């Protein structure tokens, strides 16, 4: 349970050896909330074809959870038919897999190093804009997340103009913005600006263990900004 006066959903939960589907369902019940389960598409996850996607959805449909997908690369939707993708409750995507010099820069790794912050920020913004402009997604996860070597420059990097660009694109396409518990982004200022612009929000822990649904930062930001149930994403399908 939370102290908020609206129902809470953790839309960013992964199953793992530490959190199977039965454990996730029981945990959500104990916390008095609902979970959305996401999986990455790709060979490593046996999720490459329409048949794989239908099988994944059908399995999770037997449980009281929302069924999501978390692609990591631009153009992911070309690998699945529109009918198969329509079986999902939602698609969540972040900008953490950044195309870089013919490879990918993985923002979450702790040993990353890029010498020129300005070059990074320019490419990162271009990547975010591409996702919000082109990708068929419902939730933009971890907005304004920064790699560890630039995180101390958060306020310098996330100028009002850059935050406004992200917010406006999300609002224009009806993409919800995640408040990410585990990395404590975006900032209160960003959320306040987004609320004033008419954005919708989700909470996410990126949990792969019993910490899923354990919200502190999300609740604090929601309370400070004055988020209500009307500000939160609500999916058409009911679990109850």
PLM segments and residue spans:
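Extended substrate/RNA-proximal surfaces in nucleic-acid metabolism proteins
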Residues: 47-172, 227
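Conserved residues at the C-terminal ends of beta-strands
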Residues: 38-39, 94, 143, 235
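Charged catalytic cores and adjacent phosphate/nucleic-acid-binding surfaces used
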Residues: 1-6, 19, 154-240
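Short, structured coil segments at secondary-structure junctions
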Residues: 31, 86-87, 197, 225
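Divalent metal-dependent hydrolysis catalytic cores, especially in the metallo-beta-lactamase
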Residues: 6-16, 23-46, 64-70, 138
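Active-site environment of divalent metal-dependent phosphoester hydrolases
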Residues: 16-20, 42-45, 74-75, 97-102, ...
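Conserved, mostly hydrophobic/aromatic
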Residues: 12, 28, 91, 142, ...
């Amino acid at each position: 349970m939370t102290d908020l006066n609206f129902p809470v959903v953790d839309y960013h939960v992964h199953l793992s050896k530490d959190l199977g589907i039965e454990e996730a369902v029981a945990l959500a019940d104990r916390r008095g909330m609902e979970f959305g389960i996401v999986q990455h598409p790709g060979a490593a996850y046996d999720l490459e074809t329409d048949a794989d996607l239908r099988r994944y959805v059908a399995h999770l449909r037997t449980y009281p959870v929302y069924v999501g997908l978390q692609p990591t690369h631009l153009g992911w939707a070309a690998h699945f038919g529109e009918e198969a993708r329509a079986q999902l409750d939602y698609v969540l995507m972040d900008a953490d897999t950044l195309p870089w010099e013919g490879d990918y820069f993985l923002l979450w790794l702790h040993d990353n190093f890029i010498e020129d912050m300005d070059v990074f920020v320019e490419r990162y913004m271009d990547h975010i804009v591409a996702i919000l402009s082109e990708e068929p997604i419902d939730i933009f996860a971890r907005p304004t997340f920064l790699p560890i070597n630039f995180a101390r420059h958060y306020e310098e990097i996330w100028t009002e103009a850059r935050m406004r660009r992200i917010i406006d694109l999300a609002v224009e396409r009806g993409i919800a913005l995640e408040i990410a518990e585990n990395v404590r982004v975006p900032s209160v200022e960003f959320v306040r600006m987004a609320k004033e612009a008419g954005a919708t929000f989700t909470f996410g822990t990126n949990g792969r263990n019993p910490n899923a649904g354990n919200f502190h930062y999300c609740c604090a930001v929601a309370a400070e900004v004055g988020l209500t149930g009307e500000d939160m994403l609500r999916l058409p399908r009911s679990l109850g």
